[in-house]
């Protein structure tokens, strides 16, 4: 289904054109951790390559920069954790071909855990062996994205786990969060810029989201949880939301342009407390906008759509899109999207056309999960089934949909649209003109809607190219 003009113009107004990079740079795809990509994903379930020669026990998230994908294939997971060599190699693959470019065996010290690829940006890949809840602390190794060479090792250890992820500052500094702390590390040297304490409900699921100077995390509160804002510049705590009732929670917040902050607070305690929360950060506090009943989903990662929607599951397991500001239901899948066995942990990637790629796996290495592709109105377009599909999918800068399972890795990709065909409908017409005019002016980042010649500004030069391709 082709995307409407309304969706694409709204994308520009909501800041899709201002994303700093088109790469899937961390667990949630971007600093806001909202799983929205600035590229169009594949139109069909046709794999351009598959790797079946890298089996593992646990398949971790694919992280991308340019034409490179970074991921860990964990082959050892027994306690006590005394792994053999190469138990959790970092693999760098060429996204276009699937060929391995380099591997890295992160040094192991007693009490360390499996290697994690935390994120990648500006030619640097951040990996380490912290985590295991928050039981393991380890130094961060910064690698060259091109060669895998070690650029530096951090001064301090972090306890950030694979399910938490990091958030990048605009200057590239990574921000790590774990059960009891937040830490900003200098991207050039590995030195700690600042360190703050926090509290979190369950270790291993305490990730940060960043929007401008604001870092959003979840914290424990009397008889529940709350969202707290910290300064990304100083690390100082600024203010917190009201308490969201409930016992434990195993999800992290994510955010959207305009001050929206979302939190899936569900712990299988019933309809009065298993709720999806939408807040607005007013600059001095949090305003509760709405709540919606939802399903118990530990370790889930939902996302936003380019036209101002946000995804979640209904109590019966239907995928929904609700309005970010009002909570009004916009779309719902015709059927539930639940895992066949055990609990469901939704993992989504949303492309620039508003299409939602939904993984219903619960991360178990021996469980087959379904990855469904939905239109912006949540009509199912296609699906695939993959064993042990933990933490994927991811959308790379060229529109590749990357899927990591315990037995295979897949790349799904469709050829991009013509340069001036901004809505990918096969014609250059008034709809494309509307998109270009809606994005008129300087781009805050790249890619930028309407910037056809990629010079950083949507202007008369782009208009000339569009008019020259009319038809």
Task: Describe the predicted segments one by one.
Residues 22-60, 70, 89, 97-108, ...:
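Aromatic (tryptophan-biased) beta-strands that constitute blades/sheets of beta-rich domains
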Residues 92, 142, 184, 229, ...:
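Conserved blade-register residue in beta-propeller folds
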Residues 1-9:
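Bacterial N-terminal signal peptides that target proteins for export
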Residues 24-28, 57-88, 108-140, 157-182, ...:
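Repeat-blade elements of multi-bladed beta-propeller folds
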Residues 12, 17, 415-471:
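Cellulosome-associated attachment modules in secreted, modular CAZymes
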Residues 87, 101, 122, 137, ...:
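Surface-exposed or flexible loop/turn and strand-edge residues in extracellular/cell-surface modules
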Residues 42, 94-95, 120, 144-145, ...:
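Short, acidic, Ser/Thr-enriched surface-loop or helix-capping motifs
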